[in-house]
C-alpha cells in the first residue's frame, strides 16, 4: 500500500510541476531520486514522500544521495512531502536539522509551498 501511495504522490507532483511549465521525468523504483524537473532556467532533483503521520524520518544516507546527485546534475535538491489531509510541503535539505541517523520533518518544520519553491510565492504561508 505504501508503494502505491508514494507512486500516486509522485504522479500528482508531476502534474503540478507540468502545470507550472516544467518538463518532468519520473524515475520509478528505488533509485537515487524520484523526479527530475526543469524549465530551461531551473532544475530540480526531487525526493518525494507521502505520509498519513504528522512526522516523517528520512535516513541521512537517502538525503545525502539526493544532495550528491543534484550537485552532479547541476540541479537543486528538494524534499517534497505530501502530508495526507494537509497538503504538499517542500524542503531544502540544507535547512533541515538531523540527528545521528535521520532527518525529522513534521508539521512544525518550516517549509516552502510549491510557488515558494519556484520563486512565485505571494503569501506568507509556510514562511512564518
Swiss-Prot record:
Changes seen on gene knockout: Not essential, it can be disrupted. Cell survival is unaffected by several DNA damaging agents.
InterPro entries (alphabetical): Hjc, Hjc_arc, Restrct_endonuc-II-like, tRNA_endonuc-like_dom_sf
Any GO MF annotation of the entry: magnesium ion binding
Annotated catalytic residues: 30
Binding site for Mg(2+): 10, 34, 47
Alphabetized SUPFAM superfamilies for the sequence: Restriction endonuclease-like
Cofactor(s) this protein requires: Mg(2+)
Domain of life (superkingdom): Archaea
Reactions this protein catalyses: Endonucleolytic cleavage at a junction such as a reciprocal single-stranded crossover between two homologous DNA duplexes (Holliday junction)
EC number of this enzyme: 3.1.21.10
Keywords on record: DNA damage, DNA recombination, DNA repair, DNA-binding, Endonuclease, Hydrolase, Magnesium, Metal-binding, Nuclease
Cofactor note: Binds 1 Mg(2+) ion per subunit.
A matching Pfam family: Hjc
GO biological process: DNA recombination; DNA repair
Quaternary structure (record): Homodimer.
Family classification: Belongs to the Holliday junction resolvase Hjc family.
Stated role: A structure-specific endonuclease that resolves Holliday junction (HJ) intermediates during genetic recombination. Cleaves 4-way DNA junctions introducing paired nicks in opposing strands, leaving a 5'-terminal phosphate and a 3'-terminal hydroxyl group that are subsequently ligated to produce recombinant products.
PANTHER family cross-referenced by the UniProt entry: HOLLIDAY JUNCTION RESOLVASE HJC
Name of the molecule in the record: Crossover junction endodeoxyribonuclease Hjc
The organism's taxonomic lineage, starting at the top: Archaea, Methanobacteriati, Methanobacteriota, Thermococci, Thermococcales
Gene name in the database record: hjc
